[in-house]
UniProtKB/Swiss-Prot annotation:
<keyword id="KW-0408">Iron</keyword>
<dbReference type="InterPro" id="IPR012292">
    <property type="entry name" value="Globin/Proto"/>
</dbReference>
<comment type="function">
    <text>Involved in oxygen transport from gills to the various peripheral tissues.</text>
</comment>
<keyword id="KW-0479">Metal-binding</keyword>
<protein>
    <recommendedName>
        <fullName>Hemoglobin subunit beta-2</fullName>
    </recommendedName>
</protein>
<dbReference type="GO" id="GO:0020037">
    <property type="term" value="F:heme binding"/>
</dbReference>
<dbReference type="InterPro" id="IPR002337">
    <property type="entry name" value="Hemoglobin_b"/>
</dbReference>
<dbReference type="GO" id="GO:0031720">
    <property type="term" value="F:haptoglobin binding"/>
</dbReference>
<comment type="similarity">
    <text>Belongs to the globin family.</text>
</comment>
<keyword id="KW-0813">Transport</keyword>
<keyword id="KW-0561">Oxygen transport</keyword>
<dbReference type="InterPro" id="IPR000971">
    <property type="entry name" value="Globin"/>
</dbReference>
<dbReference type="GO" id="GO:0004601">
    <property type="term" value="F:peroxidase activity"/>
</dbReference>
<comment type="subunit">
    <text>Hb2 is a heterotetramer of two alpha chains and two beta-2 chains.</text>
</comment>
<dbReference type="Pfam" id="PF00042">
    <property type="entry name" value="Globin"/>
</dbReference>
<dbReference type="GO" id="GO:0005344">
    <property type="term" value="F:oxygen carrier activity"/>
</dbReference>
<dbReference type="GO" id="GO:0046872">
    <property type="term" value="F:metal ion binding"/>
</dbReference>
């Protein structure tokens, strides 16, 4: 993947400003509410029966934060995201049996949450860079499925 200077700077800027303990839980909670079939991967998380239960679930919050810290690895290794996520791809495909389409759903939810946090600063150009980055992440996580 070729990254422009603007794209690199934009991705680094976004992730330097994201409050992981807010955005991570909000992103995963949104995914579990909007796409309820994704809940099947989180059976041990307890109350996922409604939006309030999901939003208040400590395990959802913790895993949402973990996801964002996982994205940090991609930000720090933008030139080698596929290899950076090789083990994580194996884990999700072979052990957890996660449908790879769910990575795209989660990426879309993250884009919405980030856009709401950044407001007018999330311009079309910023969104294009962010979505390109997330598309590379999603592709890398799905690498083991092919």
């Amino acid at each position: 993947v070729e990254w422009t200077d603007f794209e690199r700077a934009t991705i680094k800027d976004i992730f330097s400003k994201i409050e992981y303990d807010v955005v991570g839980p909000a992103t995963l909670a949104r995914c579990l509410v909007v796409y309820p079939w994704t809940q099947r991967y989180f059976g041990k998380f307890g109350n996922l029966y409604n939006a309030a239960g999901i939003a208040e679930n400590a395990m959802v919050s913790k895993h949402g934060i973990t996801i964002l810290h996982g994205l940090d690895r991609a930000v720090k290794n933008m030139d080698d995201i596929k290899n950076t996520y090789a083990e994580l791809s194996v884990l999700h495909s072979e052990k957890l049996h996660v449908d790879p389409d769910n990575f795209k759903l989660l990426a879309d939810c993250l884009t919405i949450v980030v856009a709401x946090r950044f407001g007018n600063g999330f311009t079309g150009e910023v969104q294009a860079a962010f979505q390109k980055f997330m598309a590379v992440v999603v592709s890398s996580l799905g690498k083991q499925y092919h």
